Amino acid sequence: MFMNTLLALGAAATVFIIIGGIILILVVMIIAIYNALVALRNRVKNGWAQIDVQLKRRYDLIPNLVEAAKGYMKHEKETLEAVTSARNQAMAAAKAVSANPTDGNAVKSLGGAEGALRGALGNLTVAMEAYPDLKASANMLQVQEELTTTENKVAFSRQAYNDSVMMYNTKRESFPSNIIAGMFNFSEASMFEVEDAAVKEVPKVQFT
């Protein structure tokens, strides 16, 4: 009888040890997955921060571009106003993304606003072709060089950001990470894409 009791207690202890071990493994796994998701999400946020720096630089340059053109393009008021309006809308959309880089709707809205801005800049570039004195202006040449350099940096930062988004979303959607992501509200991140396919390339503001 005594031996049976000892055997029963030993079996129960073994079961508890096994269950405890399984629980410990699960806890460690959850912590590891959670930390990995946090690291990838922070990478997305950092990637956006790099884009944001370049976008702000470009938004600051566009008024200089418009101001440099004003003196020559007296009959292109509507074109210049369209650039200013599109710039202001894109800047507001970028500010919304900065508040929450993983907000997919905000990122998509920025993509639309950027498409409109690049379209407006493209129209301005076409209009400038009729003003050779403007094209040769030292002030305009300086602004165009700075703007082109900034556009290239935006494109580079956007690619790095999108790569981070893909890594984060892949981890978030993979099993068993998807379970942890759902438990702790890791929302899907959106890639930063310009909506209008016609203006996805870096806008060219050089004049020859």
Regions found by a protein language model. Name each.
Residues 2-208:
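A helix-centric hydrophobic-segment signal that preferentially recognizes long
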